């Protein structure tokens, strides 16, 4: 099907995918457009939202919240997150999302007292939880899957105006607002650095977050396609 250059347009979301498609069928009717964000949706936070009891108890602890939402599968770096939790016991780590396999159970990540797995939350209310994160993360193992991944959530994090720390995925390296960690210790150090950012003293960083979010709205992606 991909070799049908006359009738098939191919849209790719990562450089690695673009390279693979070029080898198979050249550049004809090939469009690059990474993932994007509904900016307005993430700007409209419900300040009166009623959180569940588990999350309210986390908020009541008044500790920094390091957050992630998304899939939990073999590409999630459980060891990195556990290292952060053990090194920085003064942080709470909140994980929200769907289990794609049994990797979360096998990791025993929930054995750590400052790691909280909340399960799934509906898309329309997820933003209210993420708005309470102090730092947003994408701690993925670097492998063939993540080398070709444009994480949707990085643009949502940008729209929420949250400092972002990820592992060294090629698609994440493109953005000035993202702190890139190459190993467990760097992850800890960059989360700590991100926590210290504030609008009064780091206005340029938060403006970069806003601009990169606006550059990657779904409207802009649609125009490109």
Enumerate the predicted regions with their spans:
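Acidic anion/phosphate-binding donor-loop and adjacent secondary structure
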Residues: 22, 28, 37-57, 62, ...
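Carbohydrate-associated surface elements
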Residues: 16, 33-36, 45, 133
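A charged, aromatic-enriched C-terminal amphipathic alpha-helix characteristic of glycosyltransferases
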Residues: 199-225
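Conserved donor-binding/catalytic core segment of Leloir-type glycosyltransferases
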Residues: 9-10, 55-76, 81-85, 93-96, ...
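Nucleotide-sugar-dependent
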Residues: 124-129, 136-158, 166-177
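A short, active-site helix/loop in glycosyltransferases that binds the activated sugar's phosphate group
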Residues: 6-30, 41
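Nucleotide-activated donor-binding/catalytic signature segment of Leloir-type glycosyltransferases, i.e.
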Residues: 63, 97, 103-130
């Amino acid at each position: 099907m991909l070799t049908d250059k006359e009738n098939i347009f191919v849209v790719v979301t990562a450089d690695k995918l673009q390279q693979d498609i070029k080898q198979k069928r050249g550049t004809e009717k090939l469009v690059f457009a990474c993932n994007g964000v509904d900016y307005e949706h993430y700007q409209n936070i419900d300040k009166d939202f009623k959180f569940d009891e588990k999350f309210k108890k986390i908020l009541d602890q008044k500790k920094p919240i390091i957050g992630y939402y998304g899939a939990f599968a073999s590409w999630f770096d459980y060891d990195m997150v556990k290292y952060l939790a053990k090194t920085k016991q003064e942080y709470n780590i909140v994980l929200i999302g769907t289990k794609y396999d049994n990797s979360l159970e096998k990791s025993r990540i929930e054995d750590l007292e400052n790691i909280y797995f909340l399960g799934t939350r509906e898309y329309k209310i997820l933003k209210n939880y993420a708005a309470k994160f102090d730092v947003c993360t994408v701690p993925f193992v670097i492998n063939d899957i993540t080398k070709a991944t444009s994480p949707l959530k990085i643009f949502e994090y940008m729209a929420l105006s949250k400092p972002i720390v990820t592992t060294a995925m090629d698609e994440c390296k493109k953005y000035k607002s993202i702190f890139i960690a190459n190993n467990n210790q760097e992850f800890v150090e960059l989360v700590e650095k991100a926590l210290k950012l504030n609008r009064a003293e780091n206005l340029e960083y938060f403006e970069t977050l806003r601009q990169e979010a606006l550059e990657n709205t779904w409207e802009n992606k649609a125009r490109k396609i």
